[in-house]
Amino acid sequence: MVRIAIAGAAGRMGRNLVKASHLNPEASVTAGSERPESSLVGVDVGELCGEGKFDVFLTDDLTKEVDNFDVVIDFTAPVSTLANLELCKQHGKSIIIGTTGFSEEERELIDEAAKQVPVVMAPNYSVGVNLVFKLLEKAAKVMGDYCDIEIVEAHHRHKVDAPSGTAIGMGEAIAGAMGNKLSDVAVYAREGITGERTKDEIGFATIRAGDIVGEHTAMFADIGERVEITHKATDRMTFANGAVKAAVWLHSKPAGFYTMTDVLGLNEL
């Protein structure tokens, strides 16, 4: 049984992670944290997600619970995720990172930490999305040289970063399959007189509206035909279930940087 701590357990995603951990027969929720100013500190985490009492109470600092968990699942914000990563380094704990919006310097800190503790980091923990990443690699190898490639993503009005980590992950999968770095070919905004589209660019368009959980489409457009690969999420539990699956998988692994491709064995396809 893997003992799991949920960072940001009172948030929308946090509550789903608590529930997913509780429902997974190989996992147990043994700690949960929230910001010190939250009025929910001290509340039973089971009651937060509607699953009854767990006798596990929301803390304002996971350091207080460090003996009670094996793996942290963190879908919060870069600053708090890096603080929890440091905690894991100091105490030999594993961490699942679902937070997006890291700078290049922050990504380097994560890479360094992975030399000391096991880390899974992914822009999306849905099994379907990670299969899409693999399909995009194959499509890019077949069609990338002669098609225009565009990525469109849509999320709820509360999402604070753009484009989404998943959209960037799609772009990285496509660019990598074509032997490019995404930073060299990405175009994140178009406005005014932009001139004609260049051959190699990968364009991104972002929508923020309503309660959209997450929709992503990669378009390979040629003259006379267009291939679109789309994933639509309708429930955050799909991400939560994938993250808990990753936590169970990671618990037995040595220090290193892993992705959902490793968790799901997609490199074997």
From Swiss-Prot:
Pathway: Amino-acid biosynthesis; L-lysine biosynthesis via DAP pathway; (S)-tetrahydrodipicolinate from L-aspartate: step 4/4. GO terms for biological process: diaminopimelate biosynthetic process; lysine biosynthetic process via diaminopimelate. The active site is at 155 (proton donor/acceptor), 159 (proton donor). Catalyzes the conversion of 4-hydroxy-tetrahydrodipicolinate (HTPA) to tetrahydrodipicolinate. Its EC number is 1.17.1.8. The gene is dapB. Keywords: Amino-acid biosynthesis, Cytoplasm, Diaminopimelate biosynthesis, Lysine biosynthesis, NAD, NADP, Oxidoreductase. This is 4-hydroxy-tetrahydrodipicolinate reductase. (S)-2,3,4,5-tetrahydrodipicolinate binds at residues 156, 165-166.
